[in-house]
Amino acid sequence: HQFEVLGTRLITTFSNNILNNNGFLRRTRPDGLDDRRDMQFMQNGRQVFKQVVPMVSDLIVDHCADEGIDPTGLKRLWLHQANTSMNDFIGKKVMGRVPEPDEQPNILQDYANTSSAGSIIAFSHHQDGLESGDLAVICSFGAGYSAGNVIVRKR
């Protein structure tokens, strides 16, 4: 399989809904402060969901618009593989309908959350069925928040 990269786009925005409360630095202090779980990675999952879904779907839709592509015509969405519900909402916002399973592959059941590699693993395993000229998106996103989007065309 060969693909042409038509465009890339990145976005980063700050959020207090995913953070580390100085926990990793506490371990290095000479005064021996206790290793407190409440000072480590914290995530407000509902708020993350509410902020990331529109951020990522807008990134994809706006990127497609800037490239002259109608996102409802995308043949495949290879999205970050951490939360199926989040991907389903993003897919629906981007495609204007609920994507079919082959249009938005899910690899969580086989690989779990592999961080930003999930979209590339999905891309690697789910290229069949695309024809020359078909347009697709690879999009990874995560904590902070950061997202990267790649629009590709099958050769």
Q: How should each PLM-predicted stretch be described?
A:
Residues 55, 59-67:
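Stable alpha-helical structural segments in soluble proteins, enriched in small hydrophobic residues
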Residues 53, 57, 75-155:
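Claisen-condensing/thiolase-fold acyl-transfer catalytic domains that form or cleave C-C bonds
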Residues 1-50, 58, 154-155:
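Condensing-enzyme catalytic core mediating Claisen C-C bond formation in acyl metabolism
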Residues 33-34, 40, 61, 100-106:
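Short, functionally important structural connectors and interaction interfaces within domains
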Residues 46, 64, 109:
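Short, flexible active-site loop motifs that bind/organize anionic cofactors or intermediates
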